[in-house]
A protein has these predicted regions:
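Membrane-proximal alpha-helical anchors
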Residues: 1-40, 50-52
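Acidic, serine/threonine- and proline-rich intrinsically disordered appendage/tail regions
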Residues: 18-22, 33, 107-136
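Surface-exposed coil/turn segments at beta-strand junctions on protein surfaces, enriched
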Residues: 25, 74, 93-95
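Hydrophobic beta-strand positions in extracellular immunoglobulin-like domains
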Residues: 34-36, 85, 104
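A short beta-turn/strand-edge loop motif at beta-sheet boundaries
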Residues: 39-44, 92
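Intrinsically disordered, low-complexity Pro/Gly/Ser/Thr-rich segments with frequent PxxP/GP/PP motifs
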Residues: 55-90
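Serine/threonine-enriched low-complexity regions used as flexible
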Residues: 93-106
Length: 136
């Protein structure tokens, strides 16, 4: 057990920014989330997708400034934007296989690039119940 704790503490000391892009399904809505999973801030974060992604009203979500440049993304911070309702997204027969290329820099200016592949098809058949609006 002591060995695992040593490895974990060494990993956190050596941590560098780790930025991901994820698609989130919640109560019938699809969101795109940009998250810094690490204990270190990320700088000059940009995301490019391998194709256009159309959201509400057919707008190209990829064109949002959010994906072009986030000057500073704090440790453990997530920025989320609404993509569309799952019903609308899938009824337009939008692509379900999407690749996101994430570029960011650490404090010293070292550039890191990663690609994450997503398949939104996993969300097509998920059931959900619309909750009525509640007031406290």
């Amino acid at each position: 057990m002591a060995g695992k704790q040593t490895i974990k503490s060494q990993a956190s000391k050596l941590s560098e920014p780790d930025v991901i892009v994820d698609f989130v399904f919640d109560d019938g809505l699809l969101f795109i989330a940009i998250s810094n999973l690490s204990d270190k801030p990320a700088y000059k974060v940009s995301i490019t997708f391998d194709q256009e992604i159309h959201g509400l009203d057919g707008k190209d979500i990829c064109a949002l400034p959010l994906f072009r440049n986030i000057e500073f993304l704090a440790p453990h911070k997530t920025i989320t934007t609404l993509l569309d309702s799952s019903g609308s997204y899938f009824s337009r027969e939008e692509s379900t296989r999407i690749s996101a290329c994430i570029t960011h820099h650490d404090f010293q200016g070292t550039k890191k690039v990663a690609t994450i592949n997503h398949d939104l098809e996993i969300y097509r058949e998920i059931g959900f119940v619309r909750r009525p609006n509640t007031q406290d």
